[in-house]
Amino acid sequence: SQNESELASVLAHETAHVTQRHIAREINAQSKQGLVSAATILAAILIGAAAGGNGSAMEGAIAAAQGASIQQQINFTRAQEYEADRVGIGFLASAGFDPNAMANFFEAMSRQEGLNGAWIPEMLRDHPVTGNRVAEARARAAQYERRKSSQSVGYALIKERLRVLTTPREELLHLYTEIGSAHEPELDKNYGRALTLMAIERPAEAVKILQPLVERHQGNTLLYAALGQAQMEAQQKAEGLATFEHALALFPRNVPLSIRYAEGLLSAGRAQEAHVLLLDLFNNIEPTPPQIRLTAAAASQAGDSGDAYYYMSEYHISNGDLALSVQQLQLALNAPNLTVVQKERYQARLDEIRDYLATARMQRTSSNQ
């Protein structure tokens, strides 16, 4: 994407797939089509047998039936894509973005594809980025007020971060050498150069770049996170922790800042503070699996083995492994020095998971009978 509106168009398109229940509709359509396809193939076999068992004729009939089935699936998927375009453009306009951004993004995708897919007919492509699709997107966008595409500071910084994460080290060094010698380089390029210095293990130099950026742009969490991380990596731990603490005072419960602050506290031997910080985050914002695992690690380093096992149980639940979750809860219940509240909480969670597993087994048994 070249701007924030184009990025938003991708999200709007995918959101439309969800709101229009395309996955559920596709599963239902495939189940119905499977029966039709099976019946068609069976009919082809019977007709071939009745005609004297001509093997070539039967093979041709079966291939035709299978081809028709595949084409119907492609048509259904293609219709979903066009519907997601139409609904997504409405989302895009309602959110204040440029409704033409989706068509612009399609054109950029088409240029990127080049000749790679030129041999595939449009009717056989389930995600056709063609003139027809672009034209339909532009016609749909014309129904809404046109807005100018903008690019926020956050978007520009994220692009630099992604560039650093995906570009080989030697290429990054060449890319940012010229930028570093320029007079008053752009914020995003300076940020990218600082991230590059961190990637090649020169964090102290990154700190010198990031400190003035933070002072000039105090409302940007990405800059605070990068500065705090650079300070920690440069063994300026007191300064790094102070940076994170100040940032969280400005942006309470910001997840990336909280995670990096917790990691900094753990590296500084302040596990109990990290544990408290992560528990507050866990209880107020839907956690990610890595975040839950870090919470368990903080509990372990803080000497709370019961909570360490408990949050490892939650980590396994987040990954869909309920058997391992049960094992961790059993270990939690056998941990020393548990409070009454901890015992009751661990047991309640264990009972909940066991009840769920028992119900799931009963449902599988009844469905197999």
Residue ranges and their predicted role:
Residues 1-9, 76-79:
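Short pre-active-site segment immediately N-terminal to the catalytic Zn-binding motif
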Residues 2-5, 15-32, 50:
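Catalytic Zn2+-binding segment of zinc metalloproteases
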Residues 70-243, 253, 272, 321, ...:
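Extracytoplasmic and endomembrane cell-envelope/extracellular-matrix remodeling and assembly machinery
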Residues 179, 212-213, 246-247, 280-281, ...:
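Canonical positions in the second alpha-helix
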Residues 193, 227, 261, 295-298, ...:
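Structural register within alpha-helical repeat arrays
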Residues 301, 318-369:
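Terminal, low-structured helical/coil segments at or just beyond the last alpha-helical repeat
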